[in-house]
Amino acid sequence: VKQEFITIREKETTARIQASQVQAVRIKDITKKGVRVYQDGKIGIAGIVGDTEDSVLLQEAVTNLEAGIEYPFPLSKDLKDHRSYGGPIAAQEVVNEAEAILAVLRDEFPDFSFSEFVAANEIEYSMRNSEGLDLKYQDAYFNITLILKEKATANLFDGALVCGSRRFEREKFLSFNREFLAAYRNKVELPEGEKLPVFTLGADAPLEFIGRALNGERYAKGGSLFSGRLGEQLFSERITIELNRDPLLKGSPFFDAEGVVLPNDRLAVFEAGKLVNVLTDKKTALLYDLPHTGAATGGYDDVPTIDGAHGRSLAFKTDAQDIAAALKGQPAIFAFMASGGDFTADGSYATPVQVAFLFDGKRIIGKLPEFAMRSHLDKMLGEDYIGTFDNT
């Protein structure tokens, strides 16, 4: 019987905020453990929330082999890789930062009210097995979400100040958000024209859609927008999209649910606009004769699968540096909050934009009224593509 052990520990210290004041401080420290056993092409799994002895879970997992769940695939093996990206963050440090930030916001922006949280997260993921696999990922970071409300409006909320960082720099956070809130006070109209440049802080919506379309099983069965198009030029030659497991970029483990570690923590799925890989786990690769790309998902107590959400594991590679130069003097929109939209199966996209700003490539100038935008994946990443820039 081959054995595999997964342990996840998550510690969170949260300063809860209401009406621009710290109202409570809460600490959570949760351990989750899972054990997988493999015998005669079958898998048995046991899991628990809590720090239970491995031997207890091991016995339960062996019993669960009787369920007959097939898993005739080789285990990841002969690799030790331990990485740590951040040390412990004291609870008092979280409270001190929250109080300091709120003092400035109350003083300089009394026309806004702020709520939600300032938190510190410490995480540890480990996976080891009887075949010589020994992986461990440790990290710690500040996570801030301050929902803002203009006191003069009847809205439940009007936007948010957000930040995620291993090393929180208070003055940098305040400097950016002073400009953000000053622009929020300055109400401006939409520039003229049906077609305008739009920038976002991330690319969650298109990457979630692309992640679903790159599912190897869906691709092989003909149910993907990309089915049969491997090797074709689908997007701008400037675009490279990677399956990226670099914790410095993603803040998540560098291995998938089957313990697969990618070379240099990344693998291109689109390279210079060409579709060069789809997403597969061990089962999908073997079943459909596709390259194995290390994209298994699943919880600590689940059978690894390809059927998870892959958008968060994908990333555009930076291909441009100067936003102002790219705009060539044209006014642009910085879409800060756009929820309620989606892609259709053919790649068409539409969404309302709740919070957006007029942007000149260097400065946020003023807050725009709510509007709706629409496009198509082929245009967004083809003729209308401007670039992917580092967040600075």
Segments the model singles out, each with a brief description of its role:
Residues L230-T392:
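Dual-mode signal for accessory low-complexity, basic/Gly-rich regions
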Residues V1-F255, P263, E271-K274, R363:
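Active-site bordering "gate/hinge" segments
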